[in-house]
From Swiss-Prot:
Gene transcribed to yield this protein: argC
Catalytic activity line of the entry: N-acetyl-L-glutamate 5-semialdehyde + phosphate + NADP(+) = N-acetyl-L-glutamyl 5-phosphate + NADPH + H(+)
SUPFAM superfamilies: Glyceraldehyde-3-phosphate dehydrogenase-like, C-terminal domain, NAD(P)-binding Rossmann-fold domains
Classification via InterPro entries: AGPR_AS, AGPR_type-1, NAD(P)-bd_dom_sf, NAGSA_dehydrogenase, Semialdehyde_DH_NAD-bd
Protein name: N-acetyl-gamma-glutamyl-phosphate reductase
Domain of life of the organism encoding this protein: Bacteria
Gene Ontology MF term list: N-acetyl-gamma-glutamyl-phosphate reductase activity; NAD binding; NADP+ binding
Top EC class, one word: oxidoreductase
Gene3D superfamilies (alphabetical): Dihydrodipicolinate Reductase, domain 2, NAD(P)-binding Rossmann-like Domain
Pfam families with a match to the protein in the record: Semialdhyde_dh (PF01118), Semialdhyde_dhC_1 (PF22698)
Disulfide cross-links: none
Function of the protein: Catalyzes the NADPH-dependent reduction of N-acetyl-5-glutamyl phosphate to yield N-acetyl-L-glutamate 5-semialdehyde.
Amino acid sequence: MIKCGIIGGAGYTAGELIRLLLNHPDAELTFINSSSNAGNKITDVHGGLYGETDLVFTSELPLDSIDLLFFCTAHGDTKKFMENHTVPENVKIIDLSMDYRIEGPEHDFVYGLPELNRRRICNARHIANPGCFATCIQLGVLPLAKHLMLNSDLHVNAITGSTGAGVKPSSTSHFSWRNDNISIYKPFTHQHLAEINQSLSQLQKSYSSRINFIPVRGNFSRGIFATTYIDCKIDLVEIRRIYEEYYDDHSFTFITDKNPDLKQVVNTNKCLIHLQKIDDKLLIISMIDNLLKGASGQAVHNMNLLFGLEETVGLHLKPSAF
């Protein structure tokens, strides 16, 4: 069994991660650290887990008793923890924050997008789990980058559910504001652009195009629906072949002929991609569950790879489409 610890257990991604690990046949939750909830039952915070666990949050850090440490912390907190604590060499780390997503000589975290870096993930010790928008957008265009086809600007519009804003309420996540409403935020400047550009440059060394990304707040709870378009003169049959070839040996990303609906992926670790060609424009629709494929499901996928398991173990999940 893989003995797991979680630091930062009160948020939405932590709740989903706890649920996945409790039901994973090869994982055992050893502790869940939460400074704000120490001593409280997990079910006091994550009510959907009633009957699933008797665990309580702790302020202790028994790092010597685990094989894998997950960080579900606010951005910046993982880095602070690593600077002030010594994690045993034998303990692997998966960080769900953005602290180590940009690779560099100052750390050894591998960017944990399996559809891009599966081989490197299998041989890594520290994994930086990708962002939710970054995951959805990258999966839509990675095959183009591999075939050196990103030679003009990408135009992306992506709408996300309210859980993407985290568990702490704010003026823009309050129900009375978010319900029956829609708005954009951080146009052209979203923080996930850096990791997207890093990945595309990794596959296509000549890549220097701009990503014109408009993030949108949706009036639903979970999921990301992204539409991307780019200039492309190649016919749709060849484009589809390129995508199917790229994702042929990946377990969670699928190309669909039918125009898909977001509910087909909500509550799963899947990404659905639909391709359309209109004149010289290629339209790419990609969609994921922001808390699963965009966060905790992808973290468990990375755990499976780190420990030599079949990558779908613990991730056969039913969509909430009906």
